[in-house]
Swiss-Prot record:
MF terms (GO), sorted A to Z: (3R)-hydroxyacyl-[acyl-carrier-protein] dehydratase activity
Enzyme Commission number: 4.2.1.59
InterPro entries per UniProt: FabA_FabZ, FabZ, HotDog_dom_sf
Stated name of the protein: 3-hydroxyacyl-[acyl-carrier-protein] dehydratase FabZ
Family named by the database record: Belongs to the thioester dehydratase family. FabZ subfamily.
Key word Lipid metabolism present: yes
Active-site residues, as the UniProt record annotates them: H59
Family annotation (Gene3D superfamilies): Hotdog Thioesterase
Length: 153
């Protein structure tokens, strides 16, 4: 995954292109762009975390920390990019079916740049599946876990 010592990340998909793939919109679109993508395998997204995020108003005043559930949601949105580019999934909605083995390793605060990787592990009957998610800031692990999804018509 890219770190600060690497050259600036390239853009594979812009936020406008993301909005064509995902149903999420402000304030719940939690990915700014996709910086790496291998069809039907994985995607890597980027989220610039700013003090202007609406969730910082209450989480926590005077000590803003990005809620862990929103880090997991951002990972799931990157996973949605992988799914929504598969021909059989294009007209479906991907929803959470569960999460397993999720661990949070350090807080995410304003000014951080989240690098979010979602790797497709398995799909069954073109309906349900599992992804591995990993989020980093400056090369340090922030969050990791498995995400299960279901595709609905």
């Amino acid at each position: 995954m890219p770190t600060l010592t690497d050259s600036p990340p390239t853009t594979v998909l812009t936020v406008t292109e993301l909005q064509q793939l995902l149903p999420h919109r402000y304030p719940f679109l939690l990915v700014d762009r996709i910086i790496d993508y291998v069809p039907e395998k994985y995607a890597v997204g980027l989220k610039n975390v700013t003090i202007n995020e609406p969730f910082f108003q209450g989480h926590f005043p005077g000590r803003p920390i990005m809620p862990g559930v929103l880090i997991v949601e951002a990972l799931a949105q990157v996973g949605g990019v992988v799914l929504m580019q598969m021909n059989w999934a294009k007209d479906k909605l991907s929803v959470f079916a569960g999460i397993d083995k999720v661990r949070f390793r350090r807080p995410v605060v304003p000014g951080d740049q989240l690098i979010l990787r979602a790797e497709l592990l398995v799909v069954k009957q073109q309906r349900i599946g599992k992804m591995q998610g990993r989020a980093e800031v400056n090369g340090q692990l922030v969050c990791e876990g498995e995400m299960m999804f279901s595709l609905v018509d």
